[in-house]
Amino acid sequence: VLDLTRHEPRQALAAQAQVRCTDLRLEDWAQPVQSAFESGEGGIEQYLARHRAALSAGRALSHFTLYVEERPVSALTLSLLPGLARLDDIGTVQDCQGQGYATALIQAVLAFARARGARTCVLEASLDGLSIYRKAGFKPLFDYRTFCQE
């Protein structure tokens, strides 16, 4: 969880990077998501269809993509409700990971959400993403584990 009323952005965008809302260009948004989560072609097509349907239904979703020299390298989904923001689908193209692109994208989208009245932001994180989210200022609410019986 992140208190946006006290949040100060920690990282500016690199000069060659741009953040854009890509609701009308979901294919660009999908490239980093697919690369980061290693979903096959069919999986991302189903995911795109669900996101297109949600946008068509007027759901409070926005899709953001960070471009470097016009290449989509990092992406996320923002859900906004009165006073509350949620980040999902945070991913960076594998060959661009570790360069601060996701952190820069998160900071830009947090500023966007705050400007639209969000006071709190939440997200779910895997162990792999914890350092990025902590760097962005998020604090854990709780830990949980998933078990599988084979």
For each predicted feature, which ranges?
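Conserved active-site alpha-helix within GNAT-family acetyltransferase domains
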Residues: 103, 127-143, 150
